Each structure stands twice: as C-alpha cells, then as structure tokens.
Amino acid sequence: MENNFLSLIKTRRSVRAYKSEPVPSEALDAVLETGTYAPTGGGHQSPTIIAITDPKYRREIAKLNAEVMGSNTDPYYGAPVVILVLADGSASTFVEDGSCVLENMMLAAHALGLGTVWVHREREIFDSESGKALLREWKLPETLRGVGAIALGYPAQEAGQPAARKQNYIVRI
C-alpha cells in the first residue's frame, strides 16, 4: 500500500549541508504552523516554537550548542533557520509533546522541498544560566525546557538512499 503521505515519510532524510539561500517566509510560516497541530498530552499544548532567523541569535544559539557538544563547529550545519522547540517542564509529557512538534515540522519541510536535521542539546542549553538569560531576553517563561531543534534550509546536495531497515524492527504478537 502506498500513497503520497507514506512516500513523504519514507523519503525524508536528515540534511547536514545547506545552501545559504534564505527560506521564504511563506514556507517558514507553513512549516511552523504544522508544528502547532502536533498531538500533545491531554491537548495541553505545552510546547513553544522559536524560529531563529536573526543572525545574532543564530550565532549565539550555535555557540551555546557547540559548547555543550564540546566542539567549535556549527551544530546546525550552516542552515539559515534554526527552529527551537521548548516546552513547559511541568507538563509530564513535555518531551513527547515537543518531539511530535519537531516531527510534524520535519515532514512539512520535506513536503515543501526543504531539508531538516534534528539537533539535540537544547535541554542542556536552556537548563543553563545562559539559556535562562536568553529566555528572559525573549520574554519567555523560565519554566520552558529544551526538547530539540531542527536546522532548516535548502539542501546543498541530493539526499542519499536510506539504510536498510533492521531485522525484527516490527514484532507482531
């Protein structure tokens, strides 16, 4: 059984090299909106989506992420947009909620010809004093916890073939 949506899921790949070309605002808005339709525990909508296109904040968040990673490379692979997903840490499902938001946006981006890669370490960033300072600067509650981020932009190269699916990935009982 195959249809366009199933094909979309099966052809999405992580992109780790981006063109410098900006993402049109209509495309960015469409990707962001799909995140707001992700399922959340109890329908409580615990996540907050932060789209970073400002070069100053793009550099700052990359620096903070690289510090956590112990590297001096760009953890967002040169993508022109970084989308952070944080969520209310008091929600028992904040990680699951934010993860669903990230996946919705990654699939939407692929549908629009954009590339993404999920980037970790946002929890460490926003649990730190530097991260809390950013939240204060952005006038966001300090109860927000990092879930993850996606780098977003036009892929600089064609996506490769998927790895073979592992044996016993699915077990029917």
Please place each PLM-identified region on the residue numbering:
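Acidic, surface-exposed loops and disordered segments
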Residues: 1-173
